[in-house]
C-alpha cells in the first residue's frame, strides 16, 4: 500500500513553554493517517518519500520505546548526521482513546527547520539506467535488540556496490519464530552500471549480505 502524502499533511508552528517563561515555536511538518491499508511501514515509506524529495540520502531510524505519545513497539526516531529530525509511529492507543478514536492512528512529526538544514545539494542530471535491475527478497531472524537501522547498514556494506535500494517491508513475531526473536524482511534492488546482472551475480551478492548479517549481528536467513 502507498500513502497519499498530499491529502494527509499539515505544516505549522507548535508551542513549547521554556523554563524562562518564553515559548519556543518550531515549525513542524506532520503527516498522518488511519484505516485500511495504513500501518507502520506505509508511514515509514511516506517519511522516506519526504526525505528523498529534499535529497536526504543518509537518514537512519532508531526504535523509541519511551515516548508517551506513541505505541512503545511501533515508534522510531529519524536521525540525520546523528541529529534527531523527527519521530513517527502509531499513536499510543490510550492517547487515541482520550480523543474518542478507536482506530489505529499513525503520525509522523518532522522538524521543518532541521529538514531544511539537512537537505542535500540541488540535483544534477542523471541519465536513466541503461541496464535492468534485479530484485531479491530476504527475511532474516535476529534478536529483538537488533535494530532495523543496523540491519540496513550491514546489508549496504555487504552488497559490494551493486545495491541501489533496500526497503523494509515486514517485521514478524509469532509462530515459527523463537521467543525473543523477530523476523525482518527486506526487498533489495541490485543493478550494475556497465552491464546486465546475471541471476548468479545477484545471488552471490545476496549470499555475501547474508554472511555479513550472520557474522556481525547473528541474523540468519528465515
What does each model-identified segment do?
Residues 6-12, 18-30, 37-222:
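A carboxyl-terminal module marker
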Amino acid at each position: 500500500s502507498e500513502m497519499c502524502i498530499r491529502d494527509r499533511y499539515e505544516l505549522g508552528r507548535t508551542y513549547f513553554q521554556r523554563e524562562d517563561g518564553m515559548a519556543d515555536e518550531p515549525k513542524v511538518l506532520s503527516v498522518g493517517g488511519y484505516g485500511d491499508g495504513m500501518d507502520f511501514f506505509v508511514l515509514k515509506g511516506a517519511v522516506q518519500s519526504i526525505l528523498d524529495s529534499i535529497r536526504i540520502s543518509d537518514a537512519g531510524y532508531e526504535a523509541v520505546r519511551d515516548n508517551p505519545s506513541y505505541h512503545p513497539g511501533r515508534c522510531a526516531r529519524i536521525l540525520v548526521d546523528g541529529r534527531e529530525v523527527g519521530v513517527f509511529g502509531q499513536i499510543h492507543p490510550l492517547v487515541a482513546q482520550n480523543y474518542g478514536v478507536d482506530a489505529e492512528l499513525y503520525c509522523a512529526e518532522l522538524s521543518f527547520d532541521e529538514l531544511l538544514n539537512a537537505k542535500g545539494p540541488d540535483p544534477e542530471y542523471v541519465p536513466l539506467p541503461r541496464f535492468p535491475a534485479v530484485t531479491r527478497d530476504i527475511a532474516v531472524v535476529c534478536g529483538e535488540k537488533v535494530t532495523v537501522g543496523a540491519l540496513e547498514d550491514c546489508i549496504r556494506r555487504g552488497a559490494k556496490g551493486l545495491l541501489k535500494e533496500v526497503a523494509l517491508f515486514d517485521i514478524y513475531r509469532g509462530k515459527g519464530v523463537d521467543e525473543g526473536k523477530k523476523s525482518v524482511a527486506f526487498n533489495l534492488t541490485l543493478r550494475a552500471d556497465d552491464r546486465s546482472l546475471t541471476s548468479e551475480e545477484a545471488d552471490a551478492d545476496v549470499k555475501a549480505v547474508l554472511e555479513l548479517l550472520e557474522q556481525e549481528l547473528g541474523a540468519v536467513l528465515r
